[in-house]
């Protein structure tokens, strides 16, 4: 069961060479790992550490509102 302090964040994960990079756009925090699962776990840890260290002012300044992720089609010239 989720804790009252838990919040749902977005993770955008992409492959870069031999690693995966995970980005949390709401906080502009990124991490990486050798697999998708490791990158996500490392991102979760980075966000947890940020919340432990950040003061309330930094949290307000850094935290963005809702992030919308979608796909679109474009024609290559």
Where are these regions (language model features)?
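Short, charged, surface-exposed hinge/linker loops at domain edges
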Residues: 1-12, 37, 41-77
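A short, exposed loop/beta-hairpin motif centered on an aromatic-Gly-Thr core
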Residues: 27-36
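Short aromatic-glycine-(Arg/Gly/Cys) micro-motifs in beta-strand/loop hairpins
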Residues: 10-26
């Amino acid at each position: 069961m989720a804790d009252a302090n838990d919040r749902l964040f977005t993770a955008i994960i992409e492959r870069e060479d031999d690693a995966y990079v995970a980005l949390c756009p709401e906080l502009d925090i990124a991490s990486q790992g050798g697999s998708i699962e490791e990158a996500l776990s490392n991102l979760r840890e980075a966000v947890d550490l940020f919340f432990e260290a950040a003061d309330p002012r930094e949290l307000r300044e850094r935290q963005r509102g809702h992030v919308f992720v979608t796909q679109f089609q474009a024609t290559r010239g």
